[in-house]
Amino acid sequence: MDGNSLLSVPSNLESSRMYDVLEPQQGRGCGSSGSGPGNSITACKKVLRSNSLLESTDYWLQNQRMPCQIGFVEDKSENCASVCFVNLDVNKDECSTEHLQQKLVNVSPDLPKLISSMNVQQPKENEIVVLSGLASGNLQADFEVSQCPWLPDICLVQCARGNRPNSTNCIIFEINKFLIGLELVQERQLHLETNILKLEDDTNCSLSSIEEDFLTASEHLEEESEVDESRNDYENINVSANVLESKQLKGATQVEWNCNKEKWLYALEDKYINKYPTPLIKTERSPENLTKNTALQSLDPSAKPSQWKREAVGNGRQATHYYHSEAFKGQMEKSQALYIPKDAYFSMMDKDVPSACAVAEQRSNLNPGDHEDTRNALPPRQDGEVTTGKYATNLAESVLQDAFIRLSQSQSTLPQESAVSVSVGSSLLPSCYSTKDTVVSRSWNELPKIVVVQSPDGSDAAPQPGISSWPEMEVSVETSSILSGENSSRQPQSALEVALACAATVIGTISSPQATERLKMEQVVSNFPPGSSGALQTQAPQGLKEPSINEYSFPSALCGMTQVASAVAVCGLGEREEVTCSVAPSGSLPPAAEASEAMPPLCGLASMELGKEAIAKGLLKEAALVLTRPNTYSSIGDFLDSMNRRIMETASKSQTLCSENVVRNELAHTLSNVILRHSIDEVHHKNMIIDPNDNRHSSEILDTLMESTNQLLLDVICFTFKKMSHIVRLGECPAVLSKETIRRRETEPSCQPSDPGASQAWTKATESSSSSPLSNSHNTSLVINNLVDGMYSKQDKGGVRPGLFKNPTLQSQLSRSHRVPDSSTATTSSKEIYLKGIAGEDTKSPHHSENECRASSEGQRSPTVSQSRSGSQEAEESIHPNTQEKYNCATSRINEVQVNLSLLGDDLLLPAQSTLQTKHPDIYCITDFAEELADTVVSMATEIAAICLDNSSGKQPWFCAWKRGSEFLMTPNVPCRSLKRKKESQGSGTAVRKHKPPRLSEIKRKTDEHPELKEKLMNRVVDESMNLEDVPDSVNLFANEVAAKIMNLTEFSMVDGMWQAQGYPRNRLLSGDRWSRLKASSCESIPEEDSEARAYVNSLGLMSTLSQPVSRASSVSKQSSCESITDEFSRFMVNQMENEGRGFELLLDYYAGKNASSILNSAMQQACRKSDHLSVRPSCPSKQSSTESITEEFYRYMLRDIERDSRESASSRRSSQDWTAGLLSPSLRSPVCHRQSSMPDSRSPCSRLTVNVPIKANSLDGFAQNCPQDFLSVQPVSSASSSGLCKSDSCLYRRGGTDHITNMLIHETWASSIEALMRKNKIIVDDAEEADTEPVSGGSPSQAEKCANRLAASRMCSGPTLLVQESLDCPRKDSVTECKQPPVSSLSKTASLTNHSPLDSKKETSSCQDPVPINHKRRSLCSREVPLIQIETDQREACAGEPEPFLSKSSLLEEAEGHSNDKNIPDVVRGGDTAVSACQIHSDSLDTRDVPEAEASTEARAPDEAPNPPSSSEESTGSWTQLANEEDNPDDTSSFLQLSERSMSNGNSSATSSLGIMDLDIYQESMPSSPMINELVEEKKILKGQSESTEAPASGPPTGTASPQRSLLVINFDLEPECPDAELRATLQWIAASELGIPTIYFKKSQENRIEKFLDVVQLVHRKSWKVGDIFHAVVQYCKMHEEQKDGRLSLFDWLLELG
């Protein structure tokens, strides 16, 4: 429910497709919208996620939905919901021109304002802003839409194509945007239809939608009765709100109304939350909104006060109503306060109501009186303040937008408290009260300092004290929010919120210094009364910050920026810590804090952290710029502009988590450690006498420490920037500086600052503290903790954030440190531990002590603190006696850390896994775990590789410790990830030698030169690893496991033999060992495999993909496994992955492909090795892309070789069969891996190892997408392998579990390749074919069938990779799916088939003849009958009839595939394989799952088959059974193609195996576009008869797609008519509508001036029985052709008609 609940029309599809972000801009510029009182304008920004299934070209190419009807309306669309896609693209920046304005006004009077409010952030290509509830403009009038009770949802679309008119990526983006718009309209329409279609009901509709959202949330709560109650309450609230809205909103903007409604929703949610603490995702979302609103308000108190005020007022009203409805009299009063946010808040503050609320209110409404006035004058004021206000708003939005998105993403994972905290913003005051009463009542009283009620709406959720306090903190002061908020909530969300609040505050201060100052003053005043020194202090810092802001001194602004940056960094980095650290300055908060700690949020996803880090980075950059170049900005406006831009850029830019280089990290760590140590020492010396356990003392210590640290950091920053300015001016680096830097680096590495990010955070925090000294030690400690935590978190990238500071810092630091330096140092080197402990722990201990003190003050926390204290004290003591004292305060935290450490292991060397587990499970992120695991795996692999490469060279790899001692080995293992990033930082001696592992080139050279060396080393490693198993040490055990996984011990002999026999150094080592691992256990092997594969993949796919000057693509053999695994390379890979950011899927894809290819290679080699009949050529020049690592030539060679050998030796067959069985033994994988279907298929009785063409690795994308579908998750292995998940798989891991990925990869690869190969073999072998045919037709088990059965059995043994698959005919499906997924291989296969079809059409036919057997096959999954894909001889003949086209196509494909040679054999084999696959697919397709697999094949053929799909049978039929029936009529169906197509249609799931955009391009390249389409068209014509039935449905509402959904009227509105390709857009909208199952979409005749042609095209499509996939393919081909400027740039319709 990311942000869907925020949408008036939530969409599940949307949620899966994109992140919904309710735009704070909702209310912007809508004041004068003049829409009816009942109307509400809802703005929702949807961000398309690149990983979504609908973004995969595969999906669309294989889409078998029937195209919907196209209609044209002249003047009215009576029952049509309408959607207007406004294309904001303009060649010239005319957005501000009257002309464009007028155009927008034509659409809706509200539009220009909304758009201008969004102008600062033009929607990106992957974003669409959905506006609903706009007043209708002339556009509607043209349609006489007045007849339509509802207004069209206006979708603002930034044409994704931009200047790259027709790239596939853009096309898919466009389709997805249209999907979103159409889907929203559909949903809205449904809502409207459910309500009376009256204007007044429009409001009801929104309310109902909100209600629905709420209901959805409640479903999550699973409190039906409660939900009903809430619903009723909510309705009441809505009603009252409506009334109020009618009255007040008439004064206020409609937007406000919307905001209010949403706020109500939030309030309701909050209420619900109050009733049921259960976390509401929605609630979380609402907090986001609240936060946004609040943040916005904070951002520009003076600029947007009116707006905020309105919102606040509205929120207050809403809250009030809500509370009334709730019958919370007290809350009502509070709501009233909210209602009059300014006054209420003030009064509340006076009352000692959570000062946070008061502060928030103040912040929102700097001047209560003004607020009131402002409220009234809001619209005018808004206009007056438009410039600054808008700017501030935009800035705030830009700053907060991504953060909110992240928040929304992360919040769902938050514990209920977190959720509450999120919503706290809304219900802060009321909830504060209730919360205060419940959990934090005393803390509220005690902690008025928590002033985070940014928007009263948030208050609703505030019920949970921690949460409310948390948001309040955010609002009131960055620092204070961090401190107090963290104290109370420390929810990860809180952390982010705090950061956001800080950012908002900063922005607000910058934009309206006076207001900020006032607010600050008020906050200080209000905070003080509560008596929460922390709050006062917090506010004081703000005051410090803001007073200067009065005259807007850049220093103060920068200070604020720095604070924000540090807060963001801390939040992003230490979000978990924050949660854990929810150290309420006062005792009351601690409970909440503890609770939050108890439920550390699962947040801290890389993306969130990245975003926060990015924001912090942007802020820091601005600060640096200002300090360095004071004259850079001529005015505050410039500065704000730059600030806004920077923040937007950094926030929007995809970040890489591990991008920091080790040196820089270490330097940063060192600096931070030095600074912290220095500060701590200073404080320690100052307070040596003071009892560290004394809370006051600890507070003082914390304050002192914070001041010292802040001062240090500020000085550092100032000096640095000063020197920087010199450098900038002089253009050279002062020698002194250089020396200093070098010296510092030399010195500090010993300290090994935990994390550059941390140091940065510290620096920032310190700077902010320095600039705005935190009078509040709590604040300081919080900041420090946050910073520390942030540093650590950053270091870990969300490794451990359990306690913000208390545990999290220690934990994260320890875990990070442990993992990194600390882990090794802690156990390994007392010195390092000492240093680091002093630096890190000491640093932490003060923080901890602060926290502890705070905790003590909080009381509740103290127990926890004390608990952790004992453990951590010892460590502390061991670390540093003095530190220990500090630790006494921090002890609790430290102890917790210690506890964590103890969990980690006394040595802190526990495997990363242990560390992860140690970390708060909730807090510990999957990402962290995956990262750690990946690091561990990579480091292990690297170690092994290094050992193998050169254990004896004297360069002992850091992991040489294998034998030597668990501590060393463990050290590397534990921090494997850290090691990866900073091997040098490893405390353990050898571990420190990050450079020891041989260079890639070195390794490669050595391995190539001395394969025996590798073998020898590997053997030694194996032996050593075996010995290691004896070590009881958990670390050793873990290392041992890793080693064993990396190379399954049982498989070593095979691996060794393979290595010895093979000249394939890389494949031998990597794949052999991977393969063995794979065999050992899919689960266990998977993680290592993943890491290695990832490295492997990265080395190949990434390098080639990333245009790395690496010739790895040429041939896998060129890569030595060692090389791919070296730490260096692993780091590179990880960095690549991280850098890729959005390319994650691609990388994963490559990774999967590489994985599969490596597995296949190793398996093949081993198999060949075992068979003794095939020797794999170590290297083959490769035409194939690196993703296919094994080149086509190599495959062909192998095929020939294998075939020849297999013919020659039966024993080899036996062995190969055994081998294949072994390979299959791991659990089946989702089709994802199919692309690598190069595995020899031992199934065939001949057990010839025929290798399918490697399929593009892009299927992983699909796999990733599939993951969400439960295929992957079904696999039991997933949990186990997830532990071994590589970081690179983190996203996959999240999605479906790495295990699934690996399983899928392996199994898919094996199954697909093996089955396909076997099938091919069968096909190749007449006997086998006959046997296959017999089983199909006769059902008698032929050898082929037996093979298939064996394969199936092996698969089943391996464990149904996917339960779904099992049900679907796992074996077939796997292969099919695999086939499906690799479009290239599919294409090649298809080509083969196509070529083969004519060649082997009979065979195919015979094999395919038994469609029923195919169905049976389904059943026979168990029976293992191998239904052959019955490719009708007629169809085959037809194909033969079109042999040239097919052949040409095939040849083209093959050529593209690099299959050109051996067409007959490979093709036949492939074809046979494909046929087999198809058969399997049939059987599978019966499962539907297989169908997708078939689709995969089809996908390859997608262009050709796309035409076939109609013939394949109505997509609706999509079942193999039907296909089988059709196939019964050989004439009617080209079964294989049909199957493929059908599978395509069936297998939207199969579509999930997306090629990925890149792949699609490649795919297109591989397939001749026009010929393919022509072929397809021909094929379709052939199939046309079959598809006639389909055509009929096409003419009517598509049977398959037909849905209760009503038709939609699509209005396209272009600011610049010549901009978009109207035909292309209409076609894409057609595709989108078809995908949504909309029976008919109407276009405005006046808009589609080429109606005739459009209708002709529609006719053509229906006549050809094209499916959506065919249309899409044609569009893609057209775009490709268009890009190539072919065909004289025919218009799309002309081109399609010509094609037809």
From Swiss-Prot:
GO molecular function: protein kinase A binding
UniProt-listed InterPro entries: AKAP_110_C (IPR018292), SPHK1-interactor_AKAP_110 (IPR008382)
Disordered: region residues: 364-385, 742-778, 793-885, 980-1006, 1374-1414, 1481-1535, 1585-1604
Bias (Polar residues) ranges: 822-831, 857-873, 1383-1398, 1586-1604
Compositionally biased residues, Basic and acidic residues: 839-855
UniProt note on tissues of expression: Highly expressed in heart. Both isoforms abundantly expressed in ventricle. Also expressed in spleen, ovary and brain.
Cellular component GO terms held in the UniProt record: cytoplasm; mitochondrion
Biased composition annotated in UniProt, kind: Low complexity: 768-778
Cell location: Cytoplasm
Phosphoserine: residues carrying this PTM: 1025, 1085, 1107, 1120-1121, 1124, 1259, 1288
Keyword set, alphabetical order: Cytoplasm, Phosphoprotein
Region (PKA-RII subunit binding domain): 929-946
Function statement: Anchoring protein that binds preferentially to the type I regulatory subunit of c-AMP-dependent protein kinase (PKA type I) and targets it to distinct subcellular compartments. May act as a converging factor linking cAMP and sphingosine signaling pathways. Plays a regulatory role in the modulation of SPHK1.
Known partners and oligomeric status: Interacts (via the PKA-RII subunit binding domain) with the RI subunit of PKA. Interacts with SPHK1; the interaction greatly reduces SPHK1 activity.
Domain notes: RII-binding site, predicted to form an amphipathic helix, could participate in protein-protein interactions with a complementary surface on the R-subunit dimer.
Family that this chain belongs to: Belongs to the AKAP110 family.
UniProt protein name: A-kinase anchor protein SPHKAP
Organism annotation: Homo sapiens
